[in-house]
């Protein structure tokens, strides 16, 4: 019989495959659409008529659903770091299908992500799934988790009310800090809702419990806040910088929140916990390396010829332009 951890592992890996592939499908769809109309980056919507873009969107939807269900079966310490595999999938597929070459350092980044993921999978704790949403509520009402929530919300409020007006446009940690803290609470709430849905399908109805709807409301609020400030970060700063920092902060805070609320590491020996932490650090290192190679590619100048309209063709100027695309 398949264990919950094995089911969560399969779903998490499937999610990464779907999401990583969806980026390539959507990008190819955008390129086709750009050849027939205005690019999306310049306000065009011709991609909505491109079937390949829709295939990518559906693929991403399947990936997000698989990721959601994975949290129901496995602890966050197993599921969350495996999200880095989607970066590997997209990088490898982009190398072969989009002619976006994967450099040697990028290959090392992929290797680090794979090695770290294997370490986490081997030493991941076996989670004890609660038998009712009321049990999850008791876990959420533990003093340690309430302190985590209080500290997180205090930091979020301080960042929004004080730091954002002062340095939101210059300090990348303001926006990313907000969406990472809210993201950790999103995962905890979504996991609670997912377990309630799973128990309901198994015949133990959890829909009419007020705790279920409270967790659903918290999840909705946190998701909206998370998306608002992630979009602000992407709009203000380079995506090649935002992505690795956000991944590191979001993953770290999610694992901390899950360890406090669900006691993921209870019953594990020190060696297993140390191995998981080492695996996690290895995945983070690989992710940063992968994104740094992309940032280098972005910074490589493209030489372009242009003609001054007031001068002859022989008086052509050369200028180096940096590509705005990520």
Curated annotation (Swiss-Prot):
Topology term for the membrane: Multi-pass membrane protein
Signal peptide as annotated in the record: none
Keywords from the named record: Cell membrane, Endosome, Ion transport, Magnesium, Membrane, Transmembrane, Transmembrane helix, Transport
Family annotation (Pfam families): Mg_trans_NIPA
GO terms under cellular component: early endosome; plasma membrane
Cytoplasmic compartment segments: 26-51, 98-104, 164-169, 231-240, 294-326
SUPFAM superfamilies: Multidrug resistance efflux transporter EmrE (SSF103481)
Molecular function GO labels: magnesium ion transmembrane transporter activity
Subcellular location as annotated: Cell membrane; Early endosome
Transmembrane segments: 5-25, 52-72, 77-97, 105-125, 143-163, 170-190, 210-230, 241-261, 273-293
Record GO biological process: magnesium ion transport
Chain ranges on the Extracellular side, renumbered to this chain: 1-4, 73-76, 126-142, 191-209, 262-272
Top-level taxon of the source organism: Eukaryota
Cited function: Acts as a Mg(2+) transporter. Can also transport other divalent cations such as Fe(2+), Sr(2+), Ba(2+), Mn(2+) and Co(2+) but to a much less extent than Mg(2+).
Quaternary structure, from the entry: Homodimer.
Cited PANTHER family: MAGNESIUM TRANSPORTER NIPA7-RELATED, PTHR12570
Protein family per UniProt: Belongs to the NIPA (TC 2.A.7) family.
The protein's name in its UniProt record: Probable magnesium transporter NIPA7
Species for this entry: Arabidopsis thaliana (Mouse-ear cress)
Lineage: Eukaryota, Viridiplantae, Streptophyta, Embryophyta, Tracheophyta
């Amino acid at each position: 019989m398949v264990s919950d951890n094995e089911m969560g592992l399969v779903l998490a890996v499937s999610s990464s495959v779907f999401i990583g592939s969806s980026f390539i499908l959507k990008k190819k769809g955008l390129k086709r659409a750009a050849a027939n109309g205005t690019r999306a980056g310049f306000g065009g919507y011709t991609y909505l008529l491109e079937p390949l873009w829709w295939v990518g969107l559906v693929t991403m939807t399947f990936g997000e659903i698989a990721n959601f269900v994975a949290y129901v079966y496995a602890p966050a310490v197993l599921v969350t770091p495996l999200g880095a595999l989607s970066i590997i999938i997209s990088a490898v597929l982009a190398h072969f299908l989009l002619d976006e070459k994967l450099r040697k350092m990028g290959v090392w980044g992929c290797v680090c992500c794979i090695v770290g993921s294997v370490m986490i999978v081997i030493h991941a704790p076996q989670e004890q799934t609660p038998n009712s949403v009321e049990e999850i509520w008791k876990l959420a009402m533990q003093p340690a988790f309430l302190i985590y929530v209080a500290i997180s919300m205090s930091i979020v409020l301080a960042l929004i009310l004080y730091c954002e007006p002062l340095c939101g446009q210059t300090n990348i940690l303001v926006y990313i800090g907000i969406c990472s803290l809210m993201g950790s609470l999103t995962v905890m709430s979504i996991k609670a809702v997912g377990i309630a849905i799973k128990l309901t399908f198994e015949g133990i109805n959890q829909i009419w419990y007020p705790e279920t709807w409270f967790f659903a409301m918290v999840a909705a609020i946190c998701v909206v806040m998370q998306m608002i400030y992630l979009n602000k970060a992407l709009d203000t700063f380079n995506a090649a910088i935002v992505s690795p920092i956000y991944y590191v902060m979001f993953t770290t805070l999610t694992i901390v929140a899950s360890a406090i609320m669900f006691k993921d590491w209870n019953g594990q020996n020190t060696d297993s916990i140390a191995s998981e932490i080492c695996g996690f650090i290895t995945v983070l290192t690989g992710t940063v390396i992968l994104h740094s190679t992309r940032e280098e590619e972005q910074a490589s100048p493209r030489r372009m010829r242009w003609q001054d309209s007031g001068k002859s063709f022989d008086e052509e100027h050369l200028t180096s332009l940096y590509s705005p695309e990520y």
